[in-house]
Every structure is written in structure tokens, then in C-alpha cells.
Amino acid sequence: MKKLLFALILLCTISTLGLAHHSFAMYDQTKTITLTGKLTRFVLGANHAQLLFDLLGPDGKQQLDSNGKPIVWGVETGSAKQLAGAAVTVETFPYGTIFTVSLWQLRDGRNFGAMSLNGGRLIGCGTTFPQGGCNEKTGKVYLNGRDNPANDARRQGP
């Protein structure tokens, strides 16, 4: 009986750690922000991918901090498999790609966020800043929150 109780407690502890790893508590989910940037790094991971980018202003110009250095942001997305299912690959998003993304920023205010799942968008606009900005009218929508094809496949099951 003691072994069974110990195993149950151990299982509960381990599962809690797993849930904490996949928590979005570090992001402010009450506020979605939309940013446009120029891709500087595309990191594909087994569980999550990250897009790092230099922030662009509404005029398409690179935004600089008080020291004259580019303002760099990062966004965490789904897995490489989910992205590939939505046509987001290293080939479709090469370095220098201009894109717009909706995200939840870290609560501590650092320049990093998670792509919001409700209404979040990832829009690619190529390598030149389009007139009118990078948006659904001037670019291609790759991920669109609940409309993401990768999410549809998961919902339908085998």
C-alpha cells in the first residue's frame, strides 16, 4: 500500500511539473499586441519554434533603442510540425522576411512573447515593406489563430 501511495504522489508531482512547463502564465494574456519586424533568426525546436526579428515602425523603418542599436523582439510559436502544416518553413520565411505577428508579451516587459492562440496572426509580406504596411491585405496569412490548419488537423483526430 505504501508503494502504491508513493507511486501516486510521484506521478502527481511529475505531471504538475509537466503542466507548469506548458503554462502560458508568464505571458500577459489579457493584452494582445501586434508587431511588424524583419526576421533575423528562425529557431526550429521539437516543441516550439522561435522567430527573432528587428522591430519595424509603421513606416517600415528599423526601430532603434537609445544607444542606436536595433530593437530586437522574439515570438514563440507552435512546434515545427505545426508550422510546416501551415506552410511556415525556413523556405517560406527566410532571413530578411518582413512579417506581422500578434502576440502576448512577457509579463516582465521584456521584448518576447507567445503567439496568441485566440485571434493571433502571422502574416508574411516578403522582403520589402509593402505600401500600407504588412497586413492581411498586403501579405499572406500563414497562421490565423483558430483557423490554423495545424489546429484543424488536431481537432479532427485520426
Regions found by a protein language model. Name each.
Residues A84-V101:
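Short nucleic-acid-contacting surface segments enriched for D/E, G, S/T with interspersed K/R
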Residues G37-L39, I98:
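Conserved hydrophobic positions within beta-strands
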Residues F6-T16:
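Bacterial N-terminal signal peptides
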Residues G45-D59:
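Short aromatic-glycine-enriched beta-strand elements
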Residues G18-I33:
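Short boundary/loop segments of OB/S1/cold-shock single-stranded nucleic-acid-binding domains
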Residues L106-V141:
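OB-fold/S1-family single-stranded nucleic acid-binding modules
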